[in-house]
C-alpha cells in the first residue's frame, strides 16, 4: 500500500524557541519532478524544520552527495554523522530536528554514533531515485502478507522449508561446505549453502580461522543495534496521519498508525500504532510496564488523546537486530562471497550499498543467489 510521497516530522511542544505552542507536524511533500529536484522542492517549502539560511546550508552541505560522489561518502566512514554535519557548517537545529530521527529510523543508532558514510549513502540513494523515500506498508501482518506467500511459492516448486532445526555447525570437506549439523545431531547434505542470518549468528557459524580472512573478517567485528518494537492499540483514532512519522526528541523516532494506513490489521475506525523504539540500549533492562508508560508520556506530546484512549500494548524486544553502523563499520561489511567457493552470506549487514532494512536484505539475497547459480554453472 503505497503512501503519498511525503515525509512527516513531528516536533513536541517546547522543541524550539522559533515558534510557540505545539505539537508541530511538518510535511515534506515531494513533487513529480525528477530526483533530486523533487526532494529539493520539498525542502524549499518547509516552514519549521529549516529556515531560509538552513535551506541554503543544506543544499551546499550535501552537494557532494547530491552529485553522486560515492568515493566522497566512503571517505567519511571513520567519523560520525554529527561530526560531518558540523564540519559542513549545518546547524544544530537541523541536526536534532531532521537528521537525528532519520538516524534512529535507519539504524536504531543515535546521530552521534552512526557513521557519516551510512547516512550519506541513504541521502545519495534518495537523491538518485525519484521514489526512494516514499513509504509503503503491507496490507496486514508481515507473516501473513509477505513471509507465508513467499514460503507457499517455494513449496509449490518443491522446496522444503523447516524452521525447527537450529544449526549447530557447518560441515566442510576440503575447500567446500558439504552441509550442516543440527543441535539434535542430524546432518543435512548441501551442494551450496547460504548463511541468511543476523550478523552475530553468522559469526557463530563461520569457523574461527575463516573469520580472519579479509573477505569475511568483518563478520566477527560488526556489532548489532538493540530495538524494541512497540504495538499500541487505542479505542479511537488519535492521529490524522496515515504515513510514517518521524518524532523528534522522543521514544517515537519513527512510527505509523497502521489502523489507518493498513486495513489488513482489522482495527477499523481506531488507531493501532507501531513504533520502533530507539535507541533501546538503556531500555532493555526495564520491565514492559515502565517502557509503555514512557512511550505513552511521549505520545501524549504529539497526540493529546493517547492516554485516555489507550487499550493495550505489546512489546517485542530485539537485543541484536540490524548491524550497528558505527564509524568504521561500513568498510567491515562483507560481500556475499566467502573463502569457501560454495558458501555465501546474505543479510542486511552485507555490502550491497543499501541501509540495513528489508530492502537491503533482499538485495543481499539476490547477490547470494547469483553466487550459487554461478557456482552451479561452473560445476555443470
Where do the language-model regions lie?
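General small-molecule cofactor/ligand-binding pocket signal
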Residues: 160-162, 311-314, 344
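Helical element adjacent to the flavin cofactor pocket in flavoenzyme catalytic cores
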Residues: 121-184, 188-192, 196
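FAD-binding beta-loop-beta segment adjacent to the flavin cofactor pocket
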Residues: 261-267, 318-345, 349-352
Amino acid at each position: 500500500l503505497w503512501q503519498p510521497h511525503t515525509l512527516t516530522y513531528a516536533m513536541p511542544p517546547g522543541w524550539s524557541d522559533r515558534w510557540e505552542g505545539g505539537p508541530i507536524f511538518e510535511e515534506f511533500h515531494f513533487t513529480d519532478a525528477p530526483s533530486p529536484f523533487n526532494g529539493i522542492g520539498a525542502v524549499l517549502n518547509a516552514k519549521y524544520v529549516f529556515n531560509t539560511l538552513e535551506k541554503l546550508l543544506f543544499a551546499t552541505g550535501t552537494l557532494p552527495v547530491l552529485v553522486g560522489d560515492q568515493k566522497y561518502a566512503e571517505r567519511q566512514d571513520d567519523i560520525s554523522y554529527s561530526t560531518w554535519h558540523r564540519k559542513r557548517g549545518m546547524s544544530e537545529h537541523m541536526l536534532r530536528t531532521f537528521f537525528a530521527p532519520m538516524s534512529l529510523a535507519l539504524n536504531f543508532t543515535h546521530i552521534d554514533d552512526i557513521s557519516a558514510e551510512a547516512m550519506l549513502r541513504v541521502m545519495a540513494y534518495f537523491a538518485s531515485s525519484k521514489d526512494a523515500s516514499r513509504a509503503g506498508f503491507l496490507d496486514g501482518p508481515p507473516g501473513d502478507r509477505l513471509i507465508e506467500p513467499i514460503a507457499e511459492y517455494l513449496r509449490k516448486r518443491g522446496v522444503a522449508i523447516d524452521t525447527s532445526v537450529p544449526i549447530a555447525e557447518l560441515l566442510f570437506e576440503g575447500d567446500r561446505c558439504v552441509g550442516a549439523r543440527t543441535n539434535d545431531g542430524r546432518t543435512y547434505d548441501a551442494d551450496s549453502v547460504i548463511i541468511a542470518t543476523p550478523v552475530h549468528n553468522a559469526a557463530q557459524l563461520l569457523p574461527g580461522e575463516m573469520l580472519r580472512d579479509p573477505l569475511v573478517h568483518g563478520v566477527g567485528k560488526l556489532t548489532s543495534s538493540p530495538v524494541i518494537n512497540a504495538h499500541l492499540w487505542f479505542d479511537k483514532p488519535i492521529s490524522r496521519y496515515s504515513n510514517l512519522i518521524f518524532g523528534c526528541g522522543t521514544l517515537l523516532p519513527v512510527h505509523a498508525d497502521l489502523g489507518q494506513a493498513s486495513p489488513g490489521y482489522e482495527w477499523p475506525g481506531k488507531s493501532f500504532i507501531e513504533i520502533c523504539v530507539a535507541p533501546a540500549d538503556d531500555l532493555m533492562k526495564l520491565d514492559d510496564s515502565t517502557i509503555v508508560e514512557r512511550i505513552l508520556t511521549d505520545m501524549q506530546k504529539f497526540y493529546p488523546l493517547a492516554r485516555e484512549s489507550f487499550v493495550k500494548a505489546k512489546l517485542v524486544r530485539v537485543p541484536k537486530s540490524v548491524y550497528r553502523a558505527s564509524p568504521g563499520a561500513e568498510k567491515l561489511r562483507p560481500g556475499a562471497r566467502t573463502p569457501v567457493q560454495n558458501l555465501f552470506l546474505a543479510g542486511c549487514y552485507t555490502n550491497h550499498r543499501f541501509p540495513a532494512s528489508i530492502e537491503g536484505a533482499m538485495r543481499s539475497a539476490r547477490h547470494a543467489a547469483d553466487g550459487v547459480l554461478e557456482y552451479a554453472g561452473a560445476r555443470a
